[in-house]
Amino acid sequence: MSSNKKKIGIQLPRQANPEEVAIRYSLELEALDPVAEIIEVAAQTPEEFAAGVKHMDGIITSWGFRIDAALIEQLENCVVIGVGSVGVDMVDIEAATRAGIVVTNVPDVFIEEVADHAMMMLLGCARQMKTMNRMAAEGQWWSGRPLLNHTPRLMGQTLGLFAYGNVARCTARRAKSFGMHVIAFDPYVSELTISDDGVEPVSMDKLLSRSDYLSVHAPHNEETHHSFSTDAFSKMKDTAVIVNTARGPLIDEAALIVALHDKVIAGAGLDVLEQEPPSADNPLLHMENVLVSPHVASATTRMRPETRRRVGREVALVLRGRWPMSCVNPTVLPKVQLERWQPYPMNRGPNR
C-alpha cells in the first residue's frame, strides 16, 4: 500500500495477519482503497486502543471500546469516525464536534429488517407465542384457545411509536396493514410530517396512556436514557405491551421487571437489553409474558455487506473533502473544510 494514503484505524482484539486486511475489509475498501488503508489496532484495553489510533486520520467502529472524550482528546489527525450502525452511543458526539471530527452512521441500510422484527415482536406478544409454543410442546393442545379467547384482535388496537424516524415509519406502515391505529411522539419531527403519513402525533403522556402496544425507536443519549421507568409504566394500560428494537438503556430494566411482575403492564418484546449479553439469571429471560431475541433485529444476508460498503463510502467522502451522506453531528460543518455537495438536509441525525 502507498505510504501517502490516509490511515483508518479499526479495533481488533487480537493480532492478525496484516496481509489479510485487504480480504477482511474488502467491502469497506471498495470506496476507501484509492484514498486510504485500514490499520487494525490490536488492543485489550481502552488505553491501548487510544495509543493505536492516536495518529490515525479516521476510525471505523460499531463495537468494542467506546470512543469517549478522553480518547478523542488524544487524536491528532482524525477527521472522521464512521459508525457501522444506526445508533452512535459508542461515540461521544459532543466531544467529536468540539474536536472538529465528523461522525457518520448508517441510518437507512437495515430499516426494513428492524421494522420487520419490531412487528414480529408485536405479533408474537399479541398471540402469546411463548405460551402457545410451550403448551404445544407439553401436550396441552386444548389449552391455548381458551386463553386466546380472552385476547382482543389486533385490528383496531393502537400502536404507539416512541420517536418517528426511519424504522418507526416503516413499522407504522406494517401496523396499519393489520388495521391498527398508529400514534407517535417525537419532539424533533413536525406534527405535519407525522400526520402526512396517516399517523396521529401525540404528547408523551398520551402515548403512554393510549397505546395498546408501544414500540421504542429512539437513539440512546442523555435525553432518552431510561425514558421508560416506573413513572412511565404507571401511566400505561395494564394490558399494554412494550417493544424495544432500538437500544436497551432506553428502558429501565429493573423498573420493567417490577412492572411486569406486578402486572402494571402485560408484556414486552425485547431485542435489546441494558446489559448485553445478559446474565443467565436475568428475570426477563424467564418470564412467560416476555419475548427476548439476542440483538438481531437488523440481521439478514444483506445487512452486513451493505453496512460495510456504506461505512466505507461515508468515510471516503470525508477523506476526499466532501460532506458525507449521513452526518450525525452537522453542527461540525463550520469547523471543517468540506464541500457540501448533496441536497441532504442538515438536520439529519442518528434516528433519521
Residue spans of the language-model regions?
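Rossmann-like dinucleotide/phosphate-binding beta-alpha-beta segment
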Residues: S3-N4, P34, L147-D238, M346-R352
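Rossmann-like adenosine-cofactor binding region
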Residues: I67-L71, P187-P283, A299
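Short beta->alpha connector loops at strand-helix junctions that form conserved
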Residues: G84-S85, I101-E112, D186, M204-D205, ...
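Internal hydrophobic alpha-helix adjacent to the cofactor/substrate pocket in enzyme cavities
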Residues: E306-M325
